[in-house]
Amino acid sequence: MKLLAFSDVHCDLGAVESLVEQARSADVVAGVGDFASIHEGLLQTVAPLAAIEAPVLLVPGNNETADALRSATAGWDRVTVLHGETAAIDGIDFFGIGGGIPTTPWDWSFDLTEDEAANMLVALPESAVLLSHSPPKGHVDKGLGSSAVLEAARDKHARAVLCGHIHEQWTNESRIGDTLVRNLGPDGYVLEL
């Protein structure tokens, strides 16, 4: 399975158009948050993604809420918003958790505490692909990642952790044991599963 994954487009329609083009050769597409910029421009930014013919999995970032993302994609046939939920595609589980984890200093930000995230991550299936807007603590995070994401990925032997949020770490990779951790960025990353 060929997965195209990205994060943090922040209303960049040129990046979105490039991702739609790249998606023509993908079996599944995953966007792990921050489609909007401080809750503005969400609908215009995600609208082009409706043209993608493969299944599309979207996770909210800290710049949009899960409810806003669900509303913006309501009625789309191939799009699933994941926030504390799992989608199975061709025998592979994908679990999504969005928002800033731990909480950020910005009053506009969609965030989760470490405890809220840990409670949500209890549902992470064994060996799933973990789509988390926030990176795991100590991995592609500049020291700002989530302990809950780290523990869940390690304990459930995640197949991969695909994240974003920390822009200075885009395209960087790390490992939690055998688990690939990749901070994606807006250019698109292809992973064979």
How would you label these PLM feature ranges?
Residues 11, 64-152:
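Conserved catalytic scaffold of divalent metal-dependent phosphoesterases
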Residues 10, 62-63, 133, 160-167:
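Histidine-centered divalent metal-coordination motifs
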Residues 6-89, 184-187:
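Core catalytic region of metal-dependent phosphoesterases/phosphodiesterases
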Residues 27, 53, 125-126, 157:
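Residue-level detector of structured alpha->beta connecting loops
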Residues 50, 55-57, 74, 138-193:
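Conserved beta-sheet core of the metallophosphoesterase superfamily
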Residues 15-16, 40-42, 68-70, 105-106, ...:
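Short glycine-/acidic-enriched loop or helix-start segments at secondary-structure transitions
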Residues 1-4, 87-96, 129, 174-181, ...:
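Beta-strand-turn-beta hairpins that frame and shape the catalytic cleft
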Residues 3-5, 29-32, 96, 129-133, ...:
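Structural motif
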